[in-house]
Design a protein with these regions (language model features):
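An acidic/histidine-cluster motif and surrounding catalytic segment
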Residues: 1-96, 100-266
């Protein structure tokens, strides 16, 4: 039984057509989220070309022998999309996880123009561009964006062609968790720019999922505590916006601490 199936949907009014060639949505079959995907797509058309990747999952299809838990299955799905996008000769692509929730603000022309301008400046660099996350540490990139040094959530990210090429050159068995090499940068397998928009334009609820059950217990406890503190396990706002403010304050405090330590050593 084939583990994957791509279903293509065509629109003619994609919001981010100037920045991305296609959107991919990772959907684990029979997880109850298909109707949610279609509801989102009935209101939001991120690009003219949208693919839904139907993933049967490692338990119901034959995949590589080391793919034996949810995080590895998700990595395999991302890589399947990277390969498909390269075969189609796409440049930048947006990948959404099937619990994504767009903000109405993504339709506002000022945000669309800001994103298009940034993606154009990034050109052919190896980068990811984050439309929404729970940021932890960030530093200013320009007036509309931040360098996201550490963040939570890879549910709505634009991936450059060069980034796809570089990731596909890594031995898949060495990629244990998608968040670890992108959001937390664990292992530093490759160097790339990770830029985030200054406000969240796409959300997800942070709940206890099959994927999170495989996290390190210490990391999971911290993440779930922070999610509950922000109340983003129940509703996306105002928790997401508050996390952007908290991250800004935390980053300033950390920067001031580092500067003070440097000054003391002079």
């Amino acid at each position: 039984m084939e583990p994957y199936k791509f279903t293509k949907i065509i629109f003619n009014d994609g919001l981010l057509n100037k920045s991305i060639d296609a959107t991919y949505i990772i959907h684990l079959e029979n997880n109850g989220r298909y109707e949610h995907i279609m509801e989102q797509l009935s209101e939001y058309h991120p690009s003219n070309i949208v693919y839904i990747l139907f993933n049967k999952g490692y338990k119901k299809s034959k995949k590589k022998s080391f793919i034996n838990k949810s995080p590895l299955d998700l990595v395999d799905a991302f890589l399947e999309i990277f390969k498909h996008a390269n075969e189609q000769n796409y440049n930048n692509i947006l990948i959404l996880e099937d619990d994504f929730i767009f903000s109405k603000k993504i339709k506002q022309i000022n945000h669309i123009n800001n994103i298009n301008m940034t993606i154009k400046k990034l050109g052919n660099d190896d980068f990811i561009y984050i439309l929404g996350c729970i940021p932890i540490i960030k530093i200013p990139y320009d007036c509309n964006n931040y360098n996201a040094l550490t963040f939570g959530g890879t549910h709505s990210i634009i991936y450059s062609k060069q980034h796809r090429i570089n990731i596909l050159n890594i031995n898949q068995a060495d990629i244990h968790d998608w968040d670890m090499i992108h959001a937390i940068r664990f292992g530093n397998m490759i160097n790339f720019k990770q830029i985030m928009y200054y406000k969240p334009l796409c959300y997800q609820l942070f709940t206890d999922t099959e994927n999170s059950k495989n996290w390190n217990l210490y990391i999971k406890d911290i993440c779930m505590f922070y999610a509950k503190l922000l109340n983003v396990h129940k509703q996306v706002e105002p928790g997401f916006s508050n996390s952007y403010l908290i991250s800004k304050i935390l980053s300033i405090v950390l920067f001031m601490f580092i500067i003070s330590r440097i000054i003391k050593k002079l």
